[in-house]
Amino acid sequence: MALWGGRFTQAADQRFKQFNDSLRFDYRLAEQDIVGSVAWSKALVTVGVLTADEQRQLEEALNVLLEEVRANPQQILQSDAEDIHSWVEGKLIDKVGQLGKKLHTGRSRNDQVATDLKLWCKETVRELLTANRQLQSALVETAQANQDAVMPGYTHLQRAQPVTFAHWCLAYVEMLARDESRLQDTLKRLDVSPLGCGALAGTAYEIDREQLAGWLGFASATRNSLDSVSDRDHVLELLSDAAIGMVHLSRFAEDLIFFNSGEAGFVELSDRVTSGSSLMPQKKNPDALELIRGKCGRVQGALTGMMMTLKGLPLAYNKDMQEDKEGLFDALDTWLDCLHMAALVLDGIQVKRPRCQDAAQQGYANATELADYLVAKGVPFREAHHIVGEAVVEAIRQGKPLEALPLADLQKFSHVIGDDVYPMLSLQSCLDKRAAKGGVSPQQVAQAINDAKARLAL
């Protein structure tokens, strides 16, 4: 059943109908559309459009429909209705007859779909926040179990300074905490109800929109009807949140893919999140992580696509806005799936401490410690930096780590170097000295773990 037709003397071409219809994806808004319709029926009682008995009949029928949808949402796709609003109204009329035709009084699909989508976004944000915090918790637990796992930290994918696997985990906790904060901010801004704004100019019925917003669980009602039906900022914000969040997950995946590789060998992934090769029997491929990394691109594409859709639209509603849903649904589904999968990857990961330790001791990762030692002896840092660079060249020439160079060789580069230099070049010393807030010292890492556990109520 089309919700429009009196103006037309010819039926729509079937090809246009298929091109125009949105039920194949906006069926996901069925529950929100029904909930919004119940609230709207209550509002119509306050302005005398419906009697209390009529509203009761409508609400009962809508609640029955809601249970039917929850039991089998796929049934909606068997219909040839134009969109979810048409489907809900048609089903309601099937249940209550002519009374169902009164429900749309004073309401437009423009404010209706805007409300439905915001309700869906609010529910989905809560799911994302839960999954985000679950992954943060998994990272904190992994960090706590690996505080003593020393490994090389990298810049330019070159070994730079020693860190711990725990410190690496906590870096991603920080990223995820920012993702959490962005979602919470987005939720605050989208928590305003457009219902009652009509097609663009507002409703002709003196409905208390603040009361209506409260019935739907919104913090307040929107202030401008023209903006309300054309606003998709919340879609852009959520897509941006997802794009940034997926960048973080992609980096997480890339790190672990490298750590898991034969070249690094720092970790081994569980069999539960890896797959094999159809040809090479020895292979154990990090498919879960590669898919997380690969799915990042589709989320970035959804954000770019939506921005291009909106950039040239005049006020108010335009059918272009129908393009807001598929990209949003897919992007947030993808992000949610990847958050869950990242947590699963951490469940059962094995950190190979001896291999991590060996790698941390290679690559002259303690060179900065030698420079700091010279600074403590009164050598200006820039000069110390140059001296250590020369010492590293000599160590490479001899095929030795810095700490294995004889004192006489080290003193060729600076006479201030004494026997006390060797304890300073140990991995433990490298870690212990990074004791300022946010550093990699055992005390700072332990404090960061405790702080994260308190914030996450672990």
Swiss-Prot record:
Example of a GO cellular component annotation carried by this entry: cytosol
Identification of the protein by name: Argininosuccinate lyase
One Pfam family, short name: ASL_C2
Keyword Lyase on entry: yes
Cellular compartment(s): Cytoplasm
Species this chain originates from: Salmonella heidelberg (strain SL476)
Main location: cytoplasm
Class in the EC hierarchy, top level: lyase
EC assignment: 4.3.2.1
InterPro entries, per database record: Arg_succ_lyase_C, Argininosuccinate_lyase, Fumarase/histidase_N, Fumarate_lyase_CS, Fumarate_lyase_fam, Fumarate_lyase_N, L-Aspartase-like
UniProt key word Nucleotidyltransferase: no
Pathway(s) of this molecule: Amino-acid biosynthesis; L-arginine biosynthesis; L-arginine from L-ornithine and carbamoyl phosphate: step 3/3
GO biological process, one term: L-arginine biosynthetic process
SUPFAM superfamilies linked: L-aspartase-like
